[in-house]
Amino acid sequence: MVRMNVLADALKSINNAEKRGKRQVLIRPCSKVIVRFLTVMMKHGYIGEFEIIDDHRAGKIVVNLTGRLNKCGVISPRFDVQLKDLEKWQNNLFPSRQFGFIVLTTSAGIMDHEEARRKHTGGKILGFFF
């Protein structure tokens, strides 16, 4: 079976493990985009540490869960988002204001929407978590 979107698979498995109350989840295959997305989530405290396991194939990631994550998901297709349109996306995705993060891929790297606003850059929307 061919995987169409490895980021969507990874976020869905994190979501399911979090709902079941698991402490750890194994994600495979590993990719740079998944690692950067998890780094943004870890920076905000939604997940614990994660460890990349190199098995000389596609690699695996073991993520420690903290129980703080409510939902995470991918936005497909990766829409172009200008700085002024971020507010609309926040209203559509999140249950309330000042709550949750949109992850963007920009020319300055993968970051959350608040950092993109500080750096004054738009980009393509990857996903969200809250």
From Swiss-Prot:
Gene3D superfamilies xref list: 3.30.1370.30, 3.30.1490.10
Biological processes, Gene Ontology terms: ribosomal small subunit biogenesis; translation
Localization, UniProt: Cytoplasm; Nucleus, Nucleolus
UniProt entry tagged with the keyword Ribonucleoprotein: yes
Keywords: Cytoplasm, Nucleus, Ribonucleoprotein, Ribosomal protein
Pfam families: Ribosomal_S8
InterPro entries in alphabetical order: Ribosomal_uS8 (IPR000630), Ribosomal_uS8_CS (IPR047863), Ribosomal_uS8_sf (IPR035987)
GO terms for cellular component: cytoplasm; nucleolus; ribosome; small-subunit processome
Family: Belongs to the universal ribosomal protein uS8 family.
Protein name: Small ribosomal subunit protein uS8
Organism annotation: Pongo abelii (Sumatran orangutan)
Encoding gene, per UniProt annotation: RPS15A
